[in-house]
């Protein structure tokens, strides 16, 4: 099992599915979080920051900051990298659980997650931050796999709805 991927490496999987930069950031966060829950290790080495609209991997943001918020990232921006089977299966599971949600739905979900909330403690809701989102046994204790050892599928109505116009 290779675990020294970069977040940009992992991004290519989701870019090939057709995502905008906002949705990509949240899928990276959930990929890292659930990989930790399943394997007690990180999927990629990059840190995740607690930005106003949820978790962000800075290097991935810098790569796609030129794009309009809702624009789908061109598939040509995906790198051709062979991921191991464990990683592919994991990313398929993340996509099955979260891929049907919009970027704004995912923003809402992340704002309710303990790792992001803990990282934003003491900050105003509109205050920029580069604090790291900590993913560990304490912050992921409420994330549980279903009876088939899969990530539960998230329903749209489970989101808070605050960023639906985002």
Give the predicted meaning of each segment.
Residues 1-166:
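Domain-edge interaction signal
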């Amino acid at each position: 099992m290779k675990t020294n991927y970069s977040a940009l490496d992992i991004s290519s999987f989701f870019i090939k599915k057709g995502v905008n930069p906002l949705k990509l950031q949240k899928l990276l966060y959930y990929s890292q979080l659930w990989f930790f829950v399943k394997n007690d290790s990180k999927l990629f080495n990059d840190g995740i920051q607690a930005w106003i609209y949820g978790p962000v991997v800075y290097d991935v943001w810098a790569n796609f900051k030129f794009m309009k918020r809702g624009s789908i990232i061109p598939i040509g921006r995906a790198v051709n990298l062979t991921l191991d089977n464990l990683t592919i299966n994991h990313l398929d599971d993340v996509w099955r659980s979260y891929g049907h949600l919009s970027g704004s739905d995912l923003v809402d979900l992340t704002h309710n997650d303990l790792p992001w909330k803990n990282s934003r403690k003491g900050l105003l809701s509109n205050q920029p931050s580069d604090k790291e989102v900590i993913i560990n046994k304490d912050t992921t204790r409420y994330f549980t796999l279903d009876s088939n050892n899969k990530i539960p599928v998230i329903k749209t109505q489970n989101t808070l709805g605050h960023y639906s116009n985002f």
